[in-house]
Amino acid sequence: MADANKAEVPGATGGDSPHLQPAEPPGEPRREPHPAEAEKQQPQHSSSSNGVKMENDESAKEEKSDLKEKSTGSKKANRFHPYSKDKNSGAGEKKGPNRNRVFISNIPYDMKWQAIKDLMREKVGEVTYVELFKDAEGKSRGCGVVEFKDEEFVKKALETMNKYDLSGRPLNIKEDPDGENARRALQRTGGSFPGGHVPDMGSGLMNLPPSILNNPNIPPEVISNLQAGRLGSTIFVANLDFKVGWKKLKEVFSIAGTVKRADIKEDKDGKSRGMGTVTFEQAIEAVQAISMFNGQFLFDRPMHVKMDDKSVPHEEYRSHDGKTPQLPRGLGGIGMGLGPGGQPISASQLNIGGVMGNLGPGGMGMDGPGFGGMNRIGGGIGFGGLEAMNSMGGFGGVGRMGELYRGAMTSSMERDFGRGDIGINQGFGDSFGRLGSAMIGGFAGRIGSSNMGPVGSGISGGMGSMNSVTGGMGMGLDRMSSSFDRMGPGIGAILERSIDMDRGFLSGPMGSGMRERIGSKGNQIFVRNLPFDLTWQKLKEKFSQCGHVMFAEIKMENGKSKGCGTVRFDSPESAEKACRIMNGIKISGREIDVRLDRNA
């Protein structure tokens, strides 16, 4: 749910509602002071006030009394709310429209609600409420609502402040008595209405069509900001012919969407500088304009079209405290470790090989021409026939597999292997669920028997003859779905989702051996020169535009980022696309290097 900046009663930061604070003492029936009193107290208020004037000493006392009641846990039933407010209505009654409210958009992202309040109070009149909408990450959406004391101020705001230039951005102001304009704005950006009073509006990232997500003409950072609802609607156009005026600029770019304003940058003599800005009704129209017109010729000059700097939030990935972890002094950079994706191998990971017994160097070897029947599945795995699985230290013998895999192996392998970081996310339960009732029964209770006859018959439909499987298991345990492609129609698709290993499973010599032995299909990329405060969640979000991300990881050392990471996709095509369109882009001012991870 999107939070919002808001006008708060001084000292009410510890109130009950985390989203909205009353613009007056809760429960007071009216906010209008006597004109003489308001006139007397006007000079006492500065721009540092919290957006609400205290009308008189009595109201201040009542406010303190109400705050005291809050601290003891009692709550007022009639709390002020900008979208369902009626001064004279009681709790539980239906609220009417508020005709004193306006919706403001195209606000600079760095603008605070206090500045908006002071501006409106100076240019228009007394302000009783200000709220700037934010996205799920607490960043400004560039729009909000302002409520005035009287309805006449709304008309004045529309006359004097609409198209008012604020830090280079023309404000768009509309009447919004029912909150409809605010509701539409939040729906367009994929947010939810402040206060939770408008249900079923959805949240999270904005769903974009593939024509945008896969468009090579649109920078990835523009797409990610559009998805997150943080993108403005103004574009910057350069290399214009000097005879192009704002009317021609508007005429051309109206093909891409509804143009609200077009401007040509001029020098001190009033002559065109060959550049300008175009503001659209919606951010997605601005993105479409980039796709349609960047590089196109206007009067024999190719236009350079991009998002205006004020439409893109800056320092997207800066940490809240502004501190960026650095490499040790004197160290110019770091190379790749010996683990997968360049991750260093720790001493604890070196012991993983012992847990898996003979499974390590051979890497699910299948040394023979194939499986050759289920009772010969061991071979290079180290099973030694299923009765010889004692060699796998973590299992402790086939006789215990009925206990270990109770419920058709629904337990995760984290417990079975004895390590939290070598687990299978969902166990083998879902994976083998469709392989036949005998398979389930065998693994649930009778797999400890010395022969696999009943099990073999039960899985004949799913695994049948595996003689065609030679040369290992495809991509290794972290993507066993690809390995089972040729094992029969019943298992490939099932294992794709179920036997996806957790982070760190194949790090260490066992993983290195298996990956080296059985190879990779190129689903994973390695990313260098990442900001040190970038999290794996941000990394995943950044690369999600290239395809479905199965796994993302930031390489860490002593709890600090090493400035590199890996991203694994569901297909080699997505990985190649990521290398193609993401290599060289900047994240927090750092140009990242993206390439296929050959160590995966």
Curated annotation (Swiss-Prot):
One of the record's GO molecular function terms: DNA binding
Signal peptide from the UniProt entry: none
Name recorded for this polypeptide: Myelin expression factor 2
Modified residues (Omega-N-methylarginine): R406
Keywords of this entry: DNA-binding, Isopeptide bond, Methylation, Nucleus, Phosphoprotein, Repeat, Repressor, RNA-binding, Transcription, Ubl conjugation
InterPro entries: MYEF2_RRM1, MYEF2_RRM3, Nucleotide-bd_a/b_plait_sf, RBD_domain_sf, RRM_dom, RRT5_SRSF_SR
Cellular component GO terms, alphabetical: nucleus
Top-level taxon: Eukaryota
Cellular compartments annotated: Nucleus
SUPFAM superfamilies recorded: RNA-binding domain, RBD
Keyword ATP-binding tagged: no
PROSITE patterns: RRM
Provenance organism: Homo sapiens (Human)
Function summary: Transcriptional repressor of the myelin basic protein gene (MBP). Binds to the proximal MB1 element 5'-TTGTCC-3' of the MBP promoter. Its binding to MB1 and function are inhibited by PURA.
Residue ranges constituting the RRM domain according to the UniProt record: 100-178, 233-310, 523-599
Listed GO biological process terms: myotube differentiation; neuron differentiation
Subunit structure: Monomer.
Modified sites of kind Phosphothreonine: T13
Disulphide bridges, residue numbers: none
Residues annotated with Phosphoserine modification: S17, S431
Lineage of source species: Eukaryota, Metazoa, Chordata, Craniata, Vertebrata
